[in-house]
Amino acid sequence: MADYLLVVDMQSDYVAVGKAYHEELTAAVNDKIATYPSDRVIYILNRFFWERKDRKKKFATNLLVVSSRIFEKCRASCFTNPDLKDFLEGNGTKSIEFIGVDGNFCVKASVLAAVKENYQVSVDLSAVGVANQNKFQNTLYKWHSFGVTVKGELL
């Protein structure tokens, strides 16, 4: 188990009926969240640069929210949020596990940024949504080449 579980972009913008990801992914993400103590779960929400700050972002329907540790980002990598970086550093974090969406975009960028920040990084594919499976082979190759621990299989 990593020091922290980062749940990336599991929000209604991406995970809902009619979207690329739906209930099956939410159930898998919830199963993973349940394996961590609540104080070790961090949620990352994406806010597009054009969105108003006073518009509250909504988690995916039925997502298990066990922590008030919620950080927003407006770029692909969650490490563009200095508050997240300060929180992780201030808590002596050594290892991070990632789940969420999309494996080729925000999860990918966050994983690679975490490696550059010198964290031990793991990804549980059973709780990662990937819209483009073919492109994901390149992502996996890159993660392996950077020493990321990859476990589980995509849904």
Task: Describe the residue ranges of each PLM region.
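Active-site acidic carboxylates
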Residues: M1-R75, K85-D86, G90-K94, V148-T149
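Short, glycine-rich nucleotide/cofactor-binding loops
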Residues: G18-H22, I99-N104
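Histidine-anchored nucleotide/phosphate-binding helix
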Residues: A28-Y36, F105-K116
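Short, surface-exposed alpha-helical segments at coil->helix boundaries
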Residues: K53-K57, K108, Q137-L140
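Structural recognition of alpha->loop->beta junctions
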Residues: N62-F71, A131-L155
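Short beta->alpha linker loops
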Residues: R75, D102, L154-L155
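S-adenosyl-L-methionine/SAH cofactor-binding core of RNA-modifying enzymes
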Residues: S77-N81
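A short glycine-rich beta-strand->turn/loop micro-motif centered on a GG-aromatic cluster
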Residues: E97-G100, N118-Q133
